A protein has these predicted regions:
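Short beta-rich binding modules
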Residues: 1-122
Length: 122
């Protein structure tokens, strides 16, 4: 059973992982001292059109739109302002992934699993 909990964003990452995938993470701390992270989704895709082989990765429209959606949901104007903000999280229990988070006051939510279903360019 899921439970809605409040978390504070303690740090963020927006950039490339070791494998060269462009992604984001929100690192969170709950009132009970529990630390969790949200993110890790690829915001880019391999560019194989020009040569037929992987030469680079390019940011997708869906990935760029998600960055703006996160800022809007949390209620900030830029990525640097995320640090220190409070959000609500749908917590599905120990060992589960956090995929849904929202604004602390307003009824604005992002469900990352739903967002990434279907056409990658929707």
């Amino acid at each position: 059973m899921s439970e809605i909990k409040n978390y504070r964003i303690t740090s963020t990452h927006l950039g490339y992982e070791i494998l060269g995938i462009f992604t984001f993470y929100l690192h969170l701390k709950g009132a009970d001292g529990v630390h969790v992270s949200v993110g890790g989704y690829a915001l880019d895709s391999p560019d194989t059109l020009s040569t037929g082989t992987l030469t680079k990765r390019i940011l997708t429209v869906k990935g760029a739109t998600l960055i703006a959606k996160i800022l809007d949901t949390v209620g900030v104007a830029n990525w640097e302002e995320l640090h220190g903000q409070y959000i609500r999280v749908e917590d599905n229990g120990l060992g589960s992934y956090i995929t849904k988070f929202g604004n602390l006051i307003e009824d604005k939510w992002i469900d990352l699993d739903d967002y990434f279903k279907g056409d990658p360019e929707d």
